[in-house]
Amino acid sequence: MISINEVQSIANYCKLRFNEQELNHMVKQLSSIVEMMNKLEKIDCTSVPPMRHFEENNRMRKDQVEQNITVDQLLSNVPQSSATIAKNTKYFVVPKIIE
């Protein structure tokens, strides 16, 4: 069982705040998840063949720079109120959202 202090500690790391009702709900949910994980941990999987070979390399495409859209095409979507600034700086101007 996970304690309220553990949930508060995790919430502090994540910069989250919970009221008492939410905190109790999180304790129940996280305890349930840990309980399920403990059940899964007890399952014997030694006879189950792996579904993926870990020796395989990732088959990813090579990174290649491609010009799909021009800066002018992008900036054509800028609202008129910030168009001059955006065209001079080549950046989108957005409202401040973090204090």
From Swiss-Prot:
Disulfide-bonded cysteines: none
TM ranges: none
GO BP annotations, alphabetical order: glutaminyl-tRNAGln biosynthesis via transamidation; regulation of translational fidelity; translation
InterPro entries named in the record: Asp/Glu-ADT_sf_sub_c, GatC
EC numbers on record: 6.3.5.-
Keyword set, alphabetical order: ATP-binding, Ligase, Nucleotide-binding, Protein biosynthesis
Protein origin, superkingdom: Bacteria
Class of enzymatic activity (EC top level): ligase
Catalytic reactions of this protein: L-glutamyl-tRNA(Gln) + L-glutamine + ATP + H2O = L-glutaminyl-tRNA(Gln) + L-glutamate + ADP + phosphate + H(+); L-aspartyl-tRNA(Asn) + L-glutamine + ATP + H2O = L-asparaginyl-tRNA(Asn) + L-glutamate + ADP + phosphate + 2 H(+)
Stated family: Belongs to the GatC family.
Listed name of the protein: Aspartyl/glutamyl-tRNA(Asn/Gln) amidotransferase subunit C
Description of how the protein assembles with itself and partners: Heterotrimer of A, B and C subunits.
Gene name of the encoded protein: gatC
Function, as annotated: Allows the formation of correctly charged Asn-tRNA(Asn) or Gln-tRNA(Gln) through the transamidation of misacylated Asp-tRNA(Asn) or Glu-tRNA(Gln) in organisms which lack either or both of asparaginyl-tRNA or glutaminyl-tRNA synthetases. The reaction takes place in the presence of glutamine and ATP through an activated phospho-Asp-tRNA(Asn) or phospho-Glu-tRNA(Gln).
One MF term in the entry's GO annotations: asparaginyl-tRNA synthase (glutamine-hydrolyzing) activity
